Amino acid sequence: MTSNRHTNSNWLKDYKSKLFLTDTQKEVLIGTLLGDGSIKISVSGKAARLQICQSFDYKEYVFWKKSIFKEWVLSGPKYYKVNNSLIFRTVSHPEIYKFYSKFYKNKVKIIPKDINDILKSNLSLAVWFMDDGNGYQHMDSYRLSTYAFGYEGNLLLQKCLLVNFGLKTNLVRDSRGFQIYVPVRSGDADKFKKLVMNHIIPKMRYKFRNTSPVETDLTK
């Protein structure tokens, strides 16, 4: 239950004024925005909140993310039976709005043109994979589901992965759009795994297995 003080506007205003995003929180936020996370803008248009939505099957991952943003989250996660999901939201804040202004255009998530300056850490890469990646037997690759970002967005991501992480990837088109694949045979999949493995929580390590792709995104 939310404490009464959390609904007190003066207390909340003072509480928010003391918040700032740590480097770790920024890195997790970046990976989350490339994956399943979304940002909701406030009524004022000057602040925004991060929303995390995942299947209840991945509750350990949800609670891990909440632990990262613990001072930003005043309640939840809340269970929604209709789609068997867990959702939590941060407080609205100008710091998160900065990421909204980068990753959204006309309320639609995009890839910023300066993504090379944003996606630079192995932690961000790992969170992106935990959100929207998996091993894909048919393509003998690790797959990053990037349908939402269109051709141009995928090209920006592909270049970023090469420049910042030394990863050569394939851009593959199917009936739904474009996705990024990190091939096994070239050795890039092994390189990718070494970059992210220390940041993958135990519950999500199954994603390295070669399986048919399973969509877990409940927010798009």
Which residue stretches match the model-derived regions?
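Internal intein/HINT superfamily modules and their associated LAGLIDADG
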Residues: 1-220
